[in-house]
Amino acid sequence: MQTEFIKLAVIFIVIMVMVLAKLKLRDAMIAAILLTVILFGIPIGDAAKLMIQSVYEKDTLLVVGSFILVTFLQRIMENRKLLERAEMALQRLSGDRRMVCVIAPVIIGFLPSAGAVNICGAIVDKATGKDLDVEEKTFVTSYYRHISESFSPTYNAILLALSITAVSTGQFVLFMAPMVVVLLVLGYVFYLRKLSKGYEAGEDETIDKKEEFKQLLYCFWPLVLCIVLVIALNLSVIKVLPFIIVLSIIVYRLSLKEVLDFAKTSVEWRIIFNTIILMMFKNILTYTGAIGKLPDLFAGSAIPQFAAFGIIMFLGTIISGANSMIVLLIPLAFASIPHAGAGLLVYLMALSYVAMQISPTHICLAIITEYFRVSWGQLMKKTIPVIVVFVVILTGYYVLLSGFGI
């Protein structure tokens, strides 16, 4: 087991060194794939088969398809200046551009699609102007866009975790809520507080909040309707978006030329290629079976059981993604820790969530770093301090909950 752990550590270190050296994440993942094949002795034929399957498997097609559709919707919103108008309406309603940087990404974050992060990026970029540097803009966009992912049942990871435990959705959301508040506050404390409030009405200007709300609804209704349909009808985003796009074409009166132009520019091959490479790495790493053996490493150690499972969840998620670790680890943790309940699930899922914010396998990070033209390492520099503070608070919160038998 120690040998396999060392192999995983070597692979992760190579990825970190390459991205910190400002090499493209794509190149780091290709190197990681080759290294995994060599270190774990995966037959070339099996590795080739896994990589080919990764191109056309359901998960890859869903991610790529959703990204293209969301990008198409983004093109409509950009062309009709809906994002700029929504950003201004939010500023007028709240009187604070910092709230725009929080509210818009969190709302859009309920939409479980990687491509939605670019819509958030456009809003944050416009709201912050030159008052945040490009690294800070990237962090704020990615960070607040993903907060909904920590608790919303619109995400597969949450549904998967709830399905394999006896914890109800209501319990989970209730006990995760304080940690969601912590996430919101930490982003403000670290970065957003340096922004001025921004928009203030002039002496002779009267803000009609009813009209501003109507303006906001006119700009955001495609996203709101998509989120409502996904939650209410339990549908995937890729099934809902074509309907939303057709409605948007009608409501915003797009010409045939505009539709064709948007369709052409919505296919961003660079991001699609990066997505496929990430899926290849995930599948090859899963094939090794090394992640499932990580709990053996902490057997008999002095580390408390909950902390051991937390460390494994955190590290395993960074390397292989959230879903695989949820399936592998949560049943083990609930079987091993007496009286495991909502508190343990919140602890493990929160760790999985923050681990995904620094995982090189997280597709959204590849997309948003490409959008703002920064490296993965630059984003990590802004993200890791926030995560360290959050994990400390989270651990204390779990100890408190477990003390009350939750």
Regions found by a protein language model. Name each.
Residues 138, 143-146, 157, 172-185, ...:
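C-terminal transmembrane helix pair
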Residues 79-82, 92-96, 126-138, 162-170, ...:
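Juxtamembrane helix-boundary/capping and inter-helix hinge elements in multi-pass membrane proteins
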Residues 1-69, 85-89, 223-302:
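Hydrophobic transmembrane alpha-helices of multi-pass solute/ion transporters
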Residues 14, 40, 74, 112, ...:
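Alpha-helical transmembrane segments of multipass membrane proteins
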Residues 194-220, 256-265:
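Flexible interhelical linker loops that connect adjacent transmembrane helices
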Residues 33-46, 98-103, 205-223, 268-283, ...:
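Small-residue-rich segments of transmembrane alpha-helices in multi-pass membrane proteins
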Residues 66-69, 91-123, 301-340, 345-356:
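Hydrophobic alpha-helical transmembrane segments of multi-pass integral membrane proteins
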Residues 25, 62, 74-81, 109-120, ...:
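Short helix-coil transition sites and intra-membrane helix breaks within transmembrane domains
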